[in-house]
Design a protein with these regions (language model features):
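Extended, charge-rich low-complexity interaction segments
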Residues: 37-52, 148-158, 236-266, 382-393
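Conserved two-lobed SF2 helicase motor
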Residues: 9-15, 31-37, 305-313
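Conserved C-terminal motor-coupling region of P-loop helicases
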Residues: 262-386
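P-loop NTPase Walker
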Residues: 1-26
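Conserved helicase/translocase motor-coupling segment
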Residues: 171-301, 306
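Short basic/glycine-enriched coil/helix segment immediately N-terminal to the Walker B
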Residues: 30-56, 77-80, 319
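Conserved active-site motif detector
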Residues: 364-473
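Conserved helicase motor core of SF1/SF2 NTP-dependent helicases
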Residues: 55, 62-155, 164-167, 187-205, ...
Length: 473
């Protein structure tokens, strides 16, 4: 759109609300910032120019929360001629745990007498995947969308449904991956973090390279050591527009300081994404907001020979040639879980394998009797009882560590990098400095309880690595 792009603001609800309130965004203040911004607009405490808009476009409108919808209402109330365009798919509302609810997209339609355009063409998935997704979507209650999606792409594909007895049948997924030798991108999608970690460990034991998609739910990317250094160096050398030489110096400093860090690739991917979004003129404030609004999972890129392992939630917005969907323990499901499963199915382009237990598909007439009449669809029963895995992978966060233990250890910790090995002795973590063992961490009481239960099953901690190096303030 040329120069008109200079007049377009692209913001998250949270960053826009921080701006309305004249505050710098932070994780601690983000929970109630939208609610506070709505109150400020209603009380005329916000400059009129900040809320005067001619067009408002809402992406992923199915994920609006009550506060976010209230903000949209206020913007409409304050702009008589404003055009509102909302884009969303209520079948893909999978963030209810954050307060999102697709009924607010429905209220947007009913309250403002909106015209609805159904975009039903699917340019991603093959016909067998589309057929299963349509059949499964019909089991979701209170839908806005009533017409089935249509396959646009050609080519062959297949859907495989495998029913298991309850248990640890993640091994069946690993066995299928090893036997299939499928070309193209592949992903194992799970409903829980524990299952993603379990499958990742299983693949590793079988010599398969796996890329586990990680999240930064408990911290901001500002505080990731690699990005913290990059931003701090830029901030020390400029205050508004970032000159090319300052940018280059920060890149050189970061890549040199963290050459051995396993998180450097993710950090550089994040920086590269900012470069693409701002190819010519870059502002310090935009960089700060970009780091604050970004999700770590957006920058976890898999190599051609790697299997992506992720929860369905972290896979939203991605696509893969081959998807292995692990639905372990999903026996009694609600519409919330059905929408998550639907999103997982529709990540697949060509091949989809669904491993499940229970009666997830009993409500689909063409699948209820255990047969599959649709072309490219097979339904199988695997009666094998799989043993618990020999090896588990655990990811620790702030909640799993005794934070006070880090006090006074900044000199030792600053010498570590993501990926560095640590020794586990009892409930403590140690690194080796100049031939001497130095304590750098201690497990929290909650994690010690979890670890004790695993030890009662025969598991023993054998190794540990630094996941992320973070600034705590």
């Amino acid at each position: 759109i040329g120069n008109a792009a200079e007049y377009v603001e692209i913001r998250t609800f949270h960053s826009y609300c921080f701006d309305l309130l004249g505050k710098v965004g932070s994780i601690d203040d983000s929970e109630n910032v939208v609610d506070k911004a709505v109150d400020a607009v209603m009380d005329s405490q916000v400059e009129r120019s900040r809320i005067t808009k001619s067009i408002l476009v809402i992406d992923e409108a199915q994920d609006m929360s009550e506060d976010e919808f209230a903000l949209v209402r206020e913007l409409v109330r304050n702009n008589d001629d404003m055009r509102v365009i909302a884009v969303g798919d209520d079948d893909q509302n999978i963030y209810e745990f954050r307060g999102s609810d697709s009924r607010y997209m429905g209220l947007l339609i009913s309250e403002f007498n909106a015209k609805v355009y159904n975009m039903l063409e699917n340019f991603r998935s093959c016909q067998p995947v589309i057929a299963l997704a349509n059949s499964f979507a019909r089991t979701i209650g209170n839908r806005l969308k009533s017409e089935p999606i249509r396959c646009v792409v050609g080519g062959d594909g297949c859907v495989r449904l495998v029913r298991h007895p309850a248990g640890y049948y993640g091994q069946a997924v690993v066995d299928e991956i090893l036997a299939a030798h499928r070309s193209g991108s592949s992903a194992v999608l799970t409903m829980t973090n524990d299952d993603a970690l379990m499958v990742s460990a299983m693949l590793g034991r079988r010599g398969v390279k796996a890329r586990l998609i990680q999240s930064n739910d408990s911290f901001s990317l500002h505080d990731l050591a690699e990005l913290h250094l990059f931003y701090s160096d830029i901030r020390a050398n400029c205050s508004t527009i970032i000159p090319d030489n300052v940018w280059a110096h920060a890149m050189e400093l970061t890549t040199g300081e963290f050459a051995g860090s396993s998180s450097l690739e993710i950090a550089l991917s994040c920086i590269g994404a900012f470069e693409k979004e701002y190819p010519s003129k870059r502002y310090v404030s935009d960089l700060f907001n970009f780091f604050g609004e970004s999700e770590l999972s957006d920058f976890c890129k898999a190599a051609r020979n790697e299997i992506v392992v992720s929860t369905v939630h972290k896979s939203k917005g991605r696509e893969f040639d081959n998807v292995y969907l692990l639905l372990r323990g999903m026996t009694q499901i609600t519409d919330r879980e059905r929408r998550v499963i639907y999103v997982g199915m529709t990540r697949a382009k060509t091949n989809l394998s669904v491993h499940f237990d229970g009666g997830i598909f009993h409500s689909i007439p063409e699948l209820a009797d255990g047969g599959g009449s649709a072309a490219g669809l097979s339904i199988e029963n695997d009666p094998k009882l799989y043993a618990e895995p020999d090896e588990l992978l655990l990811q620790l966060s702030h909640r799993d560590l005794h934070l006070d233990c880090f006090k006074g250890k900044s000199d030792i910790i600053s010498k570590l990098c993501s990926g560095d090995a640590l020794n586990v002795i009892d409930d403590r973590l140690y690194t080796t400095v100049n031939g001497y063992s130095q304590q750098v961490g201690r497990f929290s009481e909650a994690f010690r309880t979890k670890l004790s239960k695993l030890q009662q099953k025969g598991y023993v901690p054998i190794s540990s690595r630094v996941r992320f190096l973070l600034f705590w303030h």
